[in-house]
Curated annotation (Swiss-Prot):
Protein name (record): Shieldin complex subunit 1
Function: Component of the shieldin complex, which plays an important role in repair of DNA double-stranded breaks (DSBs). During G1 and S phase of the cell cycle, the complex functions downstream of TP53BP1 to promote non-homologous end joining (NHEJ) and suppress DNA end resection. Mediates various NHEJ-dependent processes including immunoglobulin class-switch recombination, and fusion of unprotected telomeres.
Low complexity bias (residue ranges): 32-55
Disulphide linkage map: none
Complexes and interactors: Component of the shieldin complex, consisting of SHLD1, SHLD2, SHLD3 and MAD2L2/REV7. Within the complex, SHLD2 forms a scaffold which interacts with a SHLD3-MAD2L2 subcomplex via its N-terminus, and with SHLD1 via its C-terminus. Interacts with ASTE1.
Species whose genome carries this gene: Mus musculus (Mouse)
Gene Ontology terms describing biological process: DNA repair; negative regulation of double-strand break repair via homologous recombination; positive regulation of double-strand break repair via nonhomologous end joining; positive regulation of isotype switching; somatic diversification of immunoglobulins involved in immune response; telomere maintenance in response to DNA damage
DNA damage recorded as keyword: yes
PANTHER family reported for this sequence: SHIELDIN COMPLEX SUBUNIT 1
Chain intervals with Polar residues compositional bias: 56-74
Lineage, highest ranks first: Eukaryota, Metazoa, Chordata, Craniata, Vertebrata
Region (Disordered): 27-94
Keywords on record: Chromosome, DNA damage, DNA repair
Record GO cellular component, one term: site of double-strand break
């Protein structure tokens, strides 16, 4: 019986001795797990807090880049031939328009002492039409045509209109009412302006 009783105790001691490496292995495994978890946590913390960019760490460089970009944009505007050419073209057109307006205003009145009431009436009719066309960009060509006609009639009189008037009494019957298209055009005088004036009351009463 004693031999049998000693046997289980010896077996339990042996089992404890045999189980000890397993316990050691388990503790070492847990230690390695803790190390790996610590390293993974440190990596995740690094990922969640990315490194600061150069623009954040150096505000002076950011402002410098903004100033350089602004200066480059302004330089590109002046160095761009299309932008500069367009600006110069607009200025030239404005200057030319103002010069033409001054020219037409200075020579759009009958010469003093001409004594031609028809020329005065025609110029007054043209002045009214010009006032209606001023400020309309779509009628810029018509405006210049009427202004040039006013200058020509103020200088040369209205003999051109009288030749085409149906009620004129200044020319033989075979020449009355001659077509505007059949006559050689007067430089600077539009046929459309002549047709317009022939339809006005001032010419029908002449």
């Amino acid at each position: 019986m004693e031999s049998q009783a000693a046997t289980p105790s010896s077996l339990s001691g042996e089992s404890c001795t045999l189980d000890l490496p397993a316990v050691c292995d388990t503790s070492s495994y847990e230690a390695s797990q803790r190390v790996s978890q610590g390293s993974s946590n440190s990596l995740s913390s690094l990922e969640s807090h990315p490194f600061l960019s150069s623009s954040t760490t150096d505000p002076d460089s950011n402002s410098l880049n903004t100033e350089q970009k602004g200066s480059w944009d302004s330089e590109n505007f002046w160095l761009d031939p299309s932008s500069k050419g367009q600006l110069e073209t607009n200025e030239e057109e404005d200057g030319l328009r103002k010069s033409l307006d001054r020219f037409y205003e200075a020579f759009a009145h009958p010469l003093p002492g001409s004594g031609d009431p028809l020329s005065a009436s025609v110029c007054q009719c043209l002045s009214q039409t010009i006032s209606e066309l001023e400020g309309q960009e779509s009628q810029r060509y018509a405006l210049r045509s009427f202004q040039m006609a006013q200058v020509i009639f103020s200088r040369d009189g209205c003999s051109i209109l009288q030749r085409h008037s149906r009620d004129t009494r200044f020319y033989p019957l075979e020449q009355e009412g001659s077509s505007v298209d059949d006559e050689e055009p007067t430089p600077g005088l539009s046929r459309e302006v002549i047709r317009f004036l022939l339809e006005q009351t001032v010419m029908k009463d002449s």
